[in-house]
Amino acid sequence: MSVGSRVPAHELMGVREVAGGLLLVPPGVVGRAADEVRLRLVGRELGRGRWEAVAQGFSDVLVARWRPADGGPPVLVKCPRTGEAVRALVRERDAIAVLASELRPPGLRALLPETVDSRLGARPPVLVQEVLPGVPGDVLLARRPELAGPLAAAAFGVLDELHGTAGGSSRDGRLVDGWLGHRLAVLSDRVRWCRGAEGTAGLLALRSFLRRELTEHPTEVTWTHGDFTPGNLLLRSPGADPPTDNGLPVVTGLVDWADALADGPAVVDRATFALALGWLLDGRTWGEQLVAALRAGVLHRPETGELPLSDALLAWLWHVSGNLEKSRRFARNRGWLREVLVPVLRELAGSAPRSR
């Protein structure tokens, strides 16, 4: 199949390429030619079969669906375009493997994409996963926004299961420093503006506020997904029978585990979901929502209720640092920086947020 023939990412099963409300620029002509070569080489390794679909590319990972000639089920093939993307897929593969081995509820284990083959150290590197059923939550909301409340309830039910697998509460400063230090360093290293006076002041204010909040108030420590957005949640198609369980959409899969952490702050996932809803339903970027939360002292969504400012800021830090770490293109995307990153640090630099 030609790489030039591309389909919306959701048709490949939950592969989303949205970054805080702004799409990245897809690969140009040269990039598409390289993708053609990648798929040709990977196809030889996979054996007899054909490419069914190739996702529109907005990240550093080329994603395609392969149908084996022997009649077996289709698989999702992920081809990293950069070293950062290779490392992200390694993290995703390893996180899924470890989490699957620790999960006791079999229903939750079934939501994880199984690794069919991993050749991330080969040339070309590739990760092959099973295709999970379902429609991505963001696609479902675009069709039926009135389902936002039930979808959030179903999503948080999955979170309760995930977060209940292990962990406990902590105010350990060393653990908090581990959460914050690396992610703040990513912003400073990747974004030149963050190394200037205003950016540095914003980062220092962010670190001071979050460290104080997370060490003064107990924080649940457990498995965190790290990018828990509606687009990474797969749900039973509305046309399926039955499409709901007790009035809630049925979750059929949870994908994109590159930002997962075995001992992360549980609050990140719920706040990430709330911020993603703000973009999907209201068209408000993460930056706009965080500035409003900084001024109000809380993040409010009708589907999730009020969330502490520290939860929202931690989710924002997880989001922007994760994107910058997975692709250097974010640091060069002026629109993304202007709408998602700079306003938050500028607001932090201008006024220190109040503690709870």
Locate the predicted segments by residue.
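Active-site activation/catalytic loop segments of kinase-like enzymes and analogous catalytic loops
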Residues: 268-304, 316-331
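Conserved kinase catalytic-core helix
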Residues: 99-106, 133-176, 207, 213-217, ...
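Juxta-kinase regulatory segment immediately upstream of eukaryotic protein kinase catalytic domains
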Residues: 2-52
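Conserved short submotifs of the Hanks-type protein kinase catalytic core
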Residues: 124-136
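ATP-binding glycine-rich loop module of kinase domains
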Residues: 60-90
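A conserved alpha-helical element in kinase catalytic cores
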Residues: 79-124, 143-161
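ATP-binding glycine-rich phosphate-binding loop
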Residues: 41-69
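An alpha-helical support segment within catalytic cores of ATP-dependent transferases
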Residues: 33-50, 168-225, 236-238, 243-246
